């Protein structure tokens, strides 16, 4: 039985961890995940999906704010793991830790060397890519730059957003890891170096990127909305108040960027730099997420054709 230390945080990671837990060839000695966070206005403490799964299986849990130089680092190095598996962990691993195990493998949600970094799924959708994927790679000190063990891809559909693609890639990543790990560990599967000259990066989404730019084409704005749903969520402004936009559809029509060009009891169409978008699901400031029909029956009632949002 191969003894593993697992590191990860979101549901993507938990899906991969569950695959390892269900496989008798592996024993998870401990998991390392991000600290619990206070969420929302009520500051409700929320544990990570990886921590929740570890609690259900009675696995030791380590949650350092920063792994390097921590007491937790000393403790996990004493567990005697054969190797490390990471998936969307969110921290760099100290070299001393990488050197303490026989192997260290990362499950990364992109087709490397494209989209190294923390938000590959967001950028794949926002950039209008036709496919996304997962790369199983060896871990080195440089971010997502290790040799590649295996790759798998899937089409990005017009109906996909970050949430749906996250779920698809988690399953692909789980299966790809379980399929490739035995051959990798036996030496049968030889890792392939990345072409570093082709590397692109996907840094974590900044608050500035969440704001919609109505001068872009309707396809670009549409991709941007999908690439921010369900988190961190794209937004525009209506009378100085933030209006989050979760879903929209491509539409025809012309007008000034951000201008209301169609308003009925059931639809609100906004012009972009080229074409238009029909808003479907929005969230006004201080309100719950709602359909455009509910919005037009409430706060959006005062909007008129010709008005411009986003200012």
From Swiss-Prot:
E.C. designation(s): 2.1.2.9
Highest taxon above the source species: Bacteria
Residues binding (6S)-5,6,7,8-tetrahydrofolate, per UniProt: 110-113
Any Pfam family hit: Formyl_trans_N
GO-annotated cellular components: cytosol
Record key words, sorted: Protein biosynthesis, Transferase
Reactions listed under catalytic activity: L-methionyl-tRNA(fMet) + (6R)-10-formyltetrahydrofolate = N-formyl-L-methionyl-tRNA(fMet) + (6S)-5,6,7,8-tetrahydrofolate + H(+)
Example of a GO MF term: methionyl-tRNA formyltransferase activity
Function: Attaches a formyl group to the free amino group of methionyl-tRNA(fMet). The formyl group appears to play a dual role in the initiator identity of N-formylmethionyl-tRNA by promoting its recognition by IF2 and preventing the misappropriation of this tRNA by the elongation apparatus.
Family, per entry: Belongs to the Fmt family.
HAMAP family reported for this sequence: Formyl_trans (MF_00182)
Name this polypeptide is given: Methionyl-tRNA formyltransferase
Naturally occurring in which organism (per UniProt): Streptococcus pyogenes serotype M2 (strain MGAS10270)
């Amino acid at each position: 039985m191969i003894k593993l230390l697992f590191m990860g945080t979101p549901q993507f990671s938990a899906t991969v961890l569950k695959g390892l837990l269900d496989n008798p060839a592996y024993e998870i000695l401990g998991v390392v995940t991000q600290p619990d966070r206070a969420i929302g206005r009520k500051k409700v403490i929320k544990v990570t999906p990886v921590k929740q799964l570890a609690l259900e299986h009675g696995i030791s849990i380590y949650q350092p704010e920063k792994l390097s130089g921590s007491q937790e680092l000393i403790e996990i190095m004493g567990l005697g793991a054969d190797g490390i598996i990471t998936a969307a962990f969110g921290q760099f691993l100290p070299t001393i830790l990488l050197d303490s195990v026989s192997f260290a493998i990362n499950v990364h949600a992109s087709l490397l060397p494209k989209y190294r970094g923390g938000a590959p799924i967001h950028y794949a959708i926002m950039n209008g890519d036709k496919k996304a994927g997962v790369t199983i790679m060896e871990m080195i000190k440089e971010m997502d730059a290790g040799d590649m063990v295996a790759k798998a891809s899937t089409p990005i559909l017009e109906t996909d957003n970050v949430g749906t693609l996250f779920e698809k890639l988690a399953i692909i990543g789980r299966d790809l890891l379980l399929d490739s790990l035995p051959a990798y560990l036996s030496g049968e599967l030889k890792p392939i170096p990345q072409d570093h000259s082709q590397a692109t990066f996907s840094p974590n989404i900044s608050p500035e990127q969440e704001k919609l730019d109505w001068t872009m084409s309707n396809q670009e704005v549409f991709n941007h909305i999908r690439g921010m749903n369900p988190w961190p969520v794209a937004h525009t402004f209506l009378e100085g108040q933030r209006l989050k936009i979760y879903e929209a559809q491509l539409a025809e029509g012309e007008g000034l960027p951000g201008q209301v060009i169609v308003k009925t009891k059931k639809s609100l169409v906004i012009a972009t730099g080229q074409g238009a978008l029909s808003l479907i699901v929005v969230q006004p400031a201080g309100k719950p997420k709602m359909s455009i029909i509910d919005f037009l029956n409430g706060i959006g009632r005062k909007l008129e054709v010709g008005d411009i949002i986003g200012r």
